[in-house]
């Protein structure tokens, strides 16, 4: 899960792809948690297709990561909207994940210090997965997973509502191209300056 999330096809691929786009620097190097961490969390779900999670231990680790990202939705909301105490939040993570208690304590302290940041992982993953199913339903046999991924990554980091409009535009372009018997063009990418080193320091 960590390799898929942090490297390929997760954060590293997303940021490297953005750095190559023919966009202003602030767009190539921009960041939205729900998009970036959502993509990286979605990338973990591609593991079985890429030959990962073939043994019970790695599969268990992947499932625990899924549970943690889902539990964050409950705990962060509990702390910042429902009046939960730190102890309540830690107890919830201890009951609903396989993480060591000390890890869950650190997780909760993170949520307290950064309200809503950890929500982006699961929210972004769910939105990208929903867009994928939308594209598959509309395009049918025309749907190409690689081209869908390029549509998601092809404009750099975006707010989720903007991403949804971007993908919807791609779906319509694919439909129109299918009627003409041609392939819709992919977003243009050109070499660009590398990302700043700070981009690789976010904690998962």
What are these regions (language model features)?
Residues 1-204:
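N-terminal maturation segment of proteins
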């Amino acid at each position: 899960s960590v390799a898929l999330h942090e490297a390929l096809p997760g954060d590293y691929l997303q940021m490297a792809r953005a750095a190559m786009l023919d966009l202003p620097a602030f767009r190539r190097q921009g960041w939205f948690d729900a998009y970036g961490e959502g993509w990286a969390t979605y990338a973990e779900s591609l593991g079985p297709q890429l030959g990962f999670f073939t043994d019970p231990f790695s599969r268990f680790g992947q499932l625990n990561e899924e549970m943690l990202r889902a539990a964050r939705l409950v705990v962060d909301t509990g702390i910042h909207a429902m009046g939960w105490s730190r102890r309540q939040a830690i107890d919830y993570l201890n009951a609903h994940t396989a993480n060591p208690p000390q890890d869950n304590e650190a997780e909760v302290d993170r949520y307290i210090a950064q309200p809503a940041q950890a929500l982006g992982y699961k929210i972004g993953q769910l939105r990208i997965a929903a867009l994928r199913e939308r594209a598959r339903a509309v395009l049918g046999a025309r749907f190409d997973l690689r081209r869908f991924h390029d549509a998601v990554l092809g404009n750099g980091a975006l707010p989720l509502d903007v991403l949804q409009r971007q993908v919807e535009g791609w779906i319509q372009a694919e439909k129109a191209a299918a009627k003409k018997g041609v392939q819709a063009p992919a977003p243009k990418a050109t070499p660009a300056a590398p990302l700043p080193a700070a981009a690789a320091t976010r904690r998962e």
